Amino acid sequence: MLAILAIVAPVFALIGSGYLARRIGVIGPHAVSELNRVVVYLALPALLFDVMAHASWSVLYQPDFIAAFGLACGAVFYVTLAISLIAGRRLATASLDGLLGAYANTAYIGFPMLLMIYGKESLVPVTIASILTVCVLFASAMVLIELASHAERHPLRLAGKVLGSLGRNPILVAPILGVAWGATGLGLPASAETFLTLLGGAASPLALVVIGLFLAEPRPIAASETRTAVGLAAVKLVIHPAVTALLTIAFAVPPKLAAMAVLLAALPTGTGPFMLAEFYRLPAVVTSGAILLSTLAALMTLPLLMYFTGISLAP
């Protein structure tokens, strides 16, 4: 319990620092939008390019793990999306709901937690999960939000507009360029490596600070929004790992890899959905609430999962 608390404490500290800075007036009301643009246009693209440029595809080729974790993410995303649409939410916000239910905080919590449990052998599966989450799942939600944002109904013209918007989106372009660079077999200069490491490393911490800034703004919160945030946090912490566990059995994933997949799926929601909400100017009350609630609740759900599955943190 204390070991998990030590891992997630910096998450709350970053959110709290943003909240406090806004409440005492050190940072102004426009900071949420402007700082989020720093994340979306600079830090996150650098991180995604770096991850994809250094991906060793021969090492990352773990078909059973990829199938189980990837299909679980997709199933939770699209089923949650469908339920939200049936409940009357629009496609853009329903896409965020789907992302909230399936977007695990693999980078900020997953890497250190699994490193404590499994050591360096956890790096490959966590990297795979991060690529599936940050690139594939994130891009899927982005495409749907782009589709929802265009009024054009002619299929070809709509496709052209959506592709044009996606082609100008650094969050999607950066990993594609990273894959292209990695395929050349050329290494990056040391100065470029340092640049990407420094800039990419700011993505998650800065996004957490921005969430704190957002939460500090006084705004009315409807009871329905609170219920939705609680429900989405439950989907992330209970349904997502349960579906992943079933699929690891279906695909006969080796026990240790299966345990890693379930633990990664059981992580709280990462900051990606909030970045998208701010980037597309979508309502972010439910999004920020679900991220905060899932992170708080994970302090109880992760130890319970480890207890019932016999997993223990290394001292």
Question: What kind of region is each of these model predictions?
Answer:
Residues 1-315:
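Alpha-helical transmembrane segments of multi-pass small-molecule/ion transporters
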